[in-house]
């Protein structure tokens, strides 16, 4: 990683920002680096709103609520008191997945973070900067190539399979080793086999020291040989570590056959058979997701969860919409195998499968046999990639080691043969390699068989001399299947490559873990033995692991676990002494014993120096590092600050004064009290690049002097994160869901995490920073607490509470800084610089090999005809079905029904133009005044009654679809609604598909009567979700998911109650349908198309599949518009003067004093020193008659226009200020300019909030000179806002909303047809236009209980359970089955 500025300066800068952080009224999302000019400070009119409506009309703010307010004002005032979907991620005790429930069996080597593993001084220090976790480090370059591990002095050269490691560097030879090595730091280095790593490193060091002359001679000989070797021979020598170039005899394109099919090349040289496959790294995307049943650790009951396989982690959730709150995870970096469970009944389909890791076996059950097989295949691929996390796979074995070759006919598509290779001099293990050839398989078989017959392997070469005793440190092997990955060899051998744990690549050396093959005896062992069995016996390594028990439990460890108090607080580390009688002992059960005296001494010294790694978050001082200075007054005050700390402080005083007392007191037990009190006291911490606590944060918790590296390791272990994830800051806070939950916030480079610390809770939060839109500071829910709101893409807000405003502000600033540092970094597309270097080096190696192959094509026959693939193909997988073309074979007559203003009709024109291009026959049914506009685009038209001007008057006076709006419409304008329904029915005849704006109210009933598929489309959120409030019920402050969801329920209920009487009469009279209810209609099951950008309103996680956010349906008309000359001159003059240009236009709004609003706009423009293009549309039609109506003259800085296409105009300006309508907002955001929104009614408040949450603009609550001028200046000068708006504009312009909507229509058409048939069967009568075939008696029976006739099977969270129980009691139990719901 690139170096940051000095940590001290960074910390001071952070403190300064912390002190200056806001308790201001504006959102902290707009932290602006530059101060506002003095002229933009608040003036006397700072609290005045010149857009206030006429007196008596009501206003959003206090006495004058805006017109759109309704019953939701009461909801907003009361707030959210309940959470409909409480998602405490608790599970039964039998699940046992919490960190604190790791079993401690005496004979079992647990790999929890409470164990420490000693490292030899000869090993490279495994610091967190170098322990890469998921991706091991590679060094493939011209000056640091792969080298083979030298054999023991007495072994036969050339009779062993190549083992590749990196030569130890100067750092690796350092006598200092890292005192900490948590599992998460180097997950690929199997902790249980770390001793083997030491043995091989010690051997390599010793041999390098003993044989310098021979090494030099070999290099000289190799140089002379290279002069006459081919480029391919030289390249293979470098890649596979041969001692000298070997002539390439033959080359074939083939595939290595195991549980996966890996395509690559086989190279047959004079002395070796090599296999190479290029395996590019895949991006972190979700590989597979879906529902599975999981069995608990102790409870045999299966519970249903939503599973997601992403990267190396299999996570599961109680609710698929809560993807940031996992119930648990399986870290596949430690996976051993994934396989179907064997059934006693062979005829029965297997739905169960299991995943074995180094700690336990997980049992799962899929819904079908096919699903189980697909999951197993996906898991096998991930385990393979996790264990071979490189960019290439290499295998090399000497021809002399080949025992035999035989054909293995597996499939008719390819010829397959098996090569059996003896392992080495030290063991009689036999490796088996399967190679499949799609071409030239017979030639390859005959050629290799000829080589074997010419030089059969001598038996004497396999047997060591009788007097020779091979050191166990010389070789550590598994049963078979060696995998060499770039610079670090990764081995995976056993009964299939997934049946045993393989070697995992660390930053140096290698580890190997064969369960039954380390030092294989001649007697073949049962290959079905599981790797887990090797943990059952108390081997030396397991004894060391068991002895390294952590005694530095932290506060979070204490509160999170109760078994901490059940173990001794003081443990003696058992010392291992070298023993001569162990020198020749064979290694078994997957444990390597180091017998080298130096290694034993190093291990012993390392043990004396080390702590044990714990699963905690805060540590204590080492007993040997007691502060001996006299206690200061501050220390005494701190000791008495908290009740629990008084005893701890007194004990520390005695411990530092008396050696005898120090021996008598259980120091660690007192540490428990200190840490619990410290944890409840809260606080915060910042960490540097090495994850050490920054100096300015040491005072937060003085008794914690631990090395900060441990914090990062525990953080990564808690959340199964890679070692590249660096911890930056931690905070103690409350997470508010249903109840406040105390825990710890972790902020790293790419994640914001939370872990509960309350006993009995297991809530975890893993939130990628790229999904955070904004952070806002609010007052806490409880008195004396400070609130912080995290706004997430497509998810409800998260609320945190802090004890102090200082900690809250610091957390907000830290999150903002993290967001800025990676705002435009896409996780799946951009990698770290180190990862880029590794990928480039692997690609360079692959490219050079290809070039060498081409250069040497004349020296040998090349049969490489199979295209290379980076995919890991499953064996015998069903061929992937081709993409189904959902487009109907015949042209459809499609009617689009909408009412409202021009902005409501324009998106449908764009959609219909796309449908015309697809060969369909679209028609728009709307108000008659839009007919010329619609027909000029070649679209058919049908009139719908209702004056849009009258409709706008109702909206302006009462608010859009508020209770007063519906009340007036149903009383004074009852005839208007009747005419609307009747005219809509007539306009929709002769249609095959109906697409309607739900504001038209009639479409769902018309489609039911005509039995045609029905879609909805709208410009604002209308479907129930917890992520956003209803567009007509946006609160002043964030209210949370419960409030958001209830706004939709309340709106649907109120909206339907207001029109239900008229609609049902219309249904019976004209449509011939029975009366209906909201439950029978089930509008939330209707396919929905939202015509706004997913970049602006991200799809909520709880949206079902039939709701799609397609992107804006723009109608570009600017190409045919010629701008006036004076407008072009105005723009040119502004650019020449170096002035910013803004557009101001609030549409046809109604204000009490239009002159005052005009004067405010003029003064704000002059005060902000910008140029303005003004579209003045406000009027005083409903204004105060006493208000002045004198026209305000416009200065030269303002140019007034009547109309201009948004797509042309917004491309000429630097910022736009408007009312926040859906279409206007989309146009300004597409242009990539900062947007200022002053909402008035309807959905304008929603889009104004979205603009501010995205950081691309400002939403003004009031409009006056002070506020507006400052907003204009910030929108034109804030580089942060300008860049964000530019990036968002690029995203929107890259979308094709119309095309996406058409494809969504095709895909959901069959689903919509199914809904239409179900509805018509339930509600049709003999008088229906399309009557059903039911008899009169059947119709009468349906009249009683038709509400459950077609209840959906699945997660029906929208329908209340009590209602279903009530309806079920009324229904005839003998006729109707009970409604089925999901188990989840």
Swiss-Prot record:
MF terms in GO: sterol 3-beta-glucosyltransferase activity
Residue ranges, compositional bias (Basic and acidic residues): 7-19, 38-47, 578-588
Compositionally biased residues, Polar residues: 158-172, 209-229, 458-473, 483-494, 560-572, 604-629, 1322-1336
The keyword Signal is annotated on this UniProt entry: no
Subcellular location: Cytoplasm; Preautophagosomal structure membrane
Signal peptide: none
Any Gene Ontology biological process: protein transport
GRAM domain: residues covered: 237-284, 714-817
Enzyme Commission code(s) on record: 2.4.1.-, 2.4.1.173
Binding site for UDP-alpha-D-glucose: 901-902, 904, 1204, 1206, 1219, 1223-1224, 1243-1244
Membrane topology: Peripheral membrane protein
Ranges of compositional bias, category Acidic residues: 1338-1350
Boundaries of every PH domain copy: 285-384
UniProt keyword annotations, A-Z: Autophagy, Cytoplasm, Glycosyltransferase, Lipid biosynthesis, Lipid metabolism, Membrane, Protein transport, Repeat, Steroid biosynthesis, Steroid metabolism, Sterol biosynthesis, Sterol metabolism, Transferase, Transport
Disrupted gene: phenotype observed: Leads to white colonies with decreased conidiation and aerial hyphae formation. Impairs autophagy by the accumulation of the intermediate of autophagosome.
Its job: Sterol glycosyltransferase responsible for the glycosylation of ergosterol to form ergosterol-glucoside. Involved in cytoplasm to vacuole transport (Cvt), pexophagy or nonselective autophagy.
Family (UniProt): Belongs to the glycosyltransferase 28 family.
PANTHER family linked to this entry: STEROL 3-BETA-GLUCOSYLTRANSFERASE (PTHR48050:SF25)
Domain characteristics, as noted in the entry: The GRAM and PH domains are required for the localization of ATG26 to the preautophagosomal structure (PAS) and are involved in autophagy.
Entry protein name: Sterol 3-beta-glucosyltransferase
Gene that encodes it: atg26
């Amino acid at each position: 990683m690139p170096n940051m500025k000095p940590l001290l300066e960074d910390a001071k800068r952070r403190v300064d920002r912390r002190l200056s952080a806001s308790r201001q009224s504006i959102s902290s999302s707009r932290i602006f680096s530059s101060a506002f000019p003095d002229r933009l400070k608040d003036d006397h009119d700072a609290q005045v709103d010149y857009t206030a409506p006429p007196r008596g009309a009501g206003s959003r703010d206090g006495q004058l609520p805006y017109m759109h307010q309704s019953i939701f004002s009461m909801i907003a005032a009361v707030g959210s008191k309940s959470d409909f979907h409480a998602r405490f991620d608790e599970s039964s005790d039998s699940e046992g997945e919490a960190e604190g429930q790791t079993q401690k069996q005496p004979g079992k080597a647990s790999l929890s973070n409470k164990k420490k593993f000693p490292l030899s001084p000869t090993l490279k220090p495994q610091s967190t900067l170098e322990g890469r976790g998921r991706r091991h480090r590679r060094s493939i370059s011209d000056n640091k190539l792969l080298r083979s591990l030298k054999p023991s002095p007495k072994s036969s050269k050339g009779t062993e399979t190549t083992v590749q490691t990196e030569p130890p560097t100067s750092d690796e030879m350092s006598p200092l080793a890292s005192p900490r090595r948590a599992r998460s730091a180097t997950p690929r280095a199997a902790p249980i086999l770390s001793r083997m790593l030491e043995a091989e490193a010690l051997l390599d060091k010793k041999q390098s020291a003993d044989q310098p002359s021979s090494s030099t001679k070999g290099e000289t000989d190799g140089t002379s040989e290279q002069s006459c070797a081919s480029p391919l021979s030289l390249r293979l020598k470098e890649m596979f570590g041969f001692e000298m170039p070997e002539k390439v005899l033959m080359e074939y394109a083939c595939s290595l056959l195991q549980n996966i099919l890996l395509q690559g090349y086989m190279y047959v040289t004079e002395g070796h058979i090599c296999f190479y496959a290029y395996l590019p790294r895949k991006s972190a995307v979700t590989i597979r997701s879906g529902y599975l049943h999981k069995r608990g650790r102790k409870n045999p009951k299966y519970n249903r969860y939503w599973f997601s396989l992403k990267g190396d982690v299999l996570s599961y959730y109680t609710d698929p919409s809560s993807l940031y709150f996992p119930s648990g995870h399986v870290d596949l970096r430690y996976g051993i195998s994934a396989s179907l469970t064997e059934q006693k009944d062979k005829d029965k389909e297997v739905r169960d499968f299991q995943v074995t890791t180094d700690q336990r076996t997980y049992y799962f059950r899929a819904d079908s046999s096919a699903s189980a097989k697909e999951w197993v295949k996906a898991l096998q691929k991930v385990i393979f990639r996790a264990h071979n996390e490189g960019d290439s796979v290499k295998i090399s074995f000497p021809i002399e080691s080949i025992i035999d070759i035989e054909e293995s006919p597996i499939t008719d598509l390819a010829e397959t043969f098996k090569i059996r290779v003896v392992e080495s001099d030290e063991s009689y293990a036999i490796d088996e390699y399967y190679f499949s050839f799609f071409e030239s398989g017979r030639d390859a078989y005959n050629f290799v068989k000829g080589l074997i017959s010419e030089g059969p392997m001598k038996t004497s070469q396999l047997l060591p001399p009788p007097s020779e005793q091979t050191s166990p440190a010389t070789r550590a092997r598994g049963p078979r299947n060696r995998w060499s990955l770039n610079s670090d060899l990764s081995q995976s051998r056993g009964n299939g490559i997934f049946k045993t744990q393989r070697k995992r690549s660390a930053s140096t050396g290698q580890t190997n873990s064969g369960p039954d093959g380390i030092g294989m005896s001649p007697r073949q062992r049962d290959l079905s033995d599981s790797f887990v069995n090797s943990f059952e016996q108390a081997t030396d390594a397991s004894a060391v692991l068991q002895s390294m028990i952590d005694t530095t439990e932290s506060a979070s460890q204490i509160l999170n676990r109760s078994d901490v108090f059940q173990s001794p607080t003081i443990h003696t580390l058992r010392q291992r002494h070298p023993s001569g009688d162990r020198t020749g002992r064979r290694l078994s059960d997957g444990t390597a014993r180091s017998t080298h005296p130096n290694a034993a001494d190093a291990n012993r010294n390392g043990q004396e120096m080390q702590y044990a790694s714990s699963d905690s978050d805060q540590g204590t001082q080492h007993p040997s590092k007691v502060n001996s200075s006299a206690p200061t007054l501050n220390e005494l005050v701190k000791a008495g600050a908290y009740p629990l700390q008084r005893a701890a402080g007194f004990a520390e005083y005695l411990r530092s004064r008396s050696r005898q007392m120090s021996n008598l007191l259980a120091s660690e037990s007192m540490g428990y009290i200190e840490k619990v009190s410290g944890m409840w006291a809260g606080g915060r911490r910042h960490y540097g690049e090495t994850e050490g606590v920054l100096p300015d944060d040491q005072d937060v918790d003085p008794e914690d002097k631990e090395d900060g590296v441990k914090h990062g390791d525990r953080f990564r272990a808690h959340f199964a994160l890679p070692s590249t994830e660096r911890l930056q800051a931690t905070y103690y806070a409350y997470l508010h869901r249903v109840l406040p939950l105390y825990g710890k916030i972790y902020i790293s480079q790419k994640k914001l995490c939370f872990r509960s610390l309350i006993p009995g809770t297991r809530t975890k939060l893993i939130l990628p920073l790229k999904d955070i839109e904004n952070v806002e500071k609010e007052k806490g829910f409880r008195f004396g607490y400070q609130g912080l709101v995290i706004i997430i893409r497509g998810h409800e807000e998260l609320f945190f509470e802090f004890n102090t405003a200082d900690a809250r502000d610091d957390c907000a600033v830290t999150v903002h800084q993290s967001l800025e540092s990676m705002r435009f970094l896409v996780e799946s597309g951009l990698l770290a610089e180190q990862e880029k270097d590794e990928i480039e080096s692997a690609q360079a190696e692959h490219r050079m090999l290809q070039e060498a192959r081409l250069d040497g094509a004349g020296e040998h026959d090349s049969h490489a005809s199979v295209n290379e693939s980076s995919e890991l193909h499953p064996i015998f997988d069903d061929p992937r079905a081709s993409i189904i073309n959902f487009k109907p074979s015949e042209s459809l007559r499609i009617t689009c029904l909408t009412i409202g203003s021009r902005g409501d009709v324009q998106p449908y024109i764009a959609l219909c133009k796309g449908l015309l291009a697809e060969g369909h026959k679209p028609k728009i049914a709307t108000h008659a005044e839009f007919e010329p506009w619609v027909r000029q685009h070649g679209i058919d038209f049908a009139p719908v009654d209702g004056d849009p001007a009258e409709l706008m008057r109702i909206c302006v006076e009462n608010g859009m679809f508020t209770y007063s709006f519906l009340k007036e419409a149903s009383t004074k304008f009852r005839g208007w609604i009747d005419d609307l329904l009747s005219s809509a029915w007539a306009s929709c005849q002769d249609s095959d598909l109906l697409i309607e704006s739900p504001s038209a109210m009639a479409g769902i009933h018309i489609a039911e009567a005509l039995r045609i598929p029905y879609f909805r489309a709208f410009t604002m959120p209308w479907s129930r979700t917890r992520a956003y409030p209803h567009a007509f019920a946006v609160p002043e402050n964030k209210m949370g998911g419960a409030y958001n969801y209830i706004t939709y329920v309340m709106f649907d209920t109120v909206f339907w109650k207001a029109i239900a009487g008229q609609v049902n009469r219309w249904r019976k009279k004209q449509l011939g349908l029975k009366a209906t209810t909201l439950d029978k209609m089930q509008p939330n099951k209707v396919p929905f198309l939202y015509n706004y950008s997913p970049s602006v309103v991200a799809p909520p996680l709880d949206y079902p599949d039939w709701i799609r956010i397609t992107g804006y349906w723009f109608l570009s008309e600017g190409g045919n518009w010629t701008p006036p000359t004076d407008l072009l001159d105005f723009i040119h003059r502004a650019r020449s003067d170096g002035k910013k240009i803004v557009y101001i236009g609030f549409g046809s709004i109604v204000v009490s004093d239009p002159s005052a609003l005009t004067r405010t706009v003029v003064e704000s423009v002059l005060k902000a020193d910008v140029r303005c293009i003004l579209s003045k549309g406000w009027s005083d039609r409903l204004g105060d008659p006493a208000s002045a109506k004198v026209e305000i003259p416009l200065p030269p800085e303002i140019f007034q226009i009547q109309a201009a296409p948004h797509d042309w105009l917004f491309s000429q300006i630097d910022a736009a200020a408007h009312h926040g309508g859906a279409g206007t907002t989309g146009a300004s955001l597409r242009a990539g300019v900062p947007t200022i929104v002053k909402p008035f009614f309807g959905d304008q408040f929603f889009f104004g909030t979205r603009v501010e949450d995205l950081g691309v603009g400002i939403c003004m609550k009031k409009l006056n000179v002070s506020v507006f001028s400052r907003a204009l200046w910030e929108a034109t000068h804030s580089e942060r806002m300008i860049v964000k708006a530019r990036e968002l504009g690029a995203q929107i312009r890259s979308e094709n909303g119309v095309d996406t909507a058409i494809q969504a229509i095709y895909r959901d058409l069959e689903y919509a047809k199914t809904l239409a048939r179900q509805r018509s069967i339930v509600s049709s009568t003999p008088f229906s236009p399309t009557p059903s075939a039911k008899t009169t008696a059947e119709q009468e029976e349906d009249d009683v209980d038709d509400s459950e006739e077609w209840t959906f099977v699945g997660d029906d969270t929208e329908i209340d359970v009590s209602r279903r129980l009530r309806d079920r009691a009324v229904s005839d139990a003998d006729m109707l089955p009970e409604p089925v719901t999901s188990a989840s």
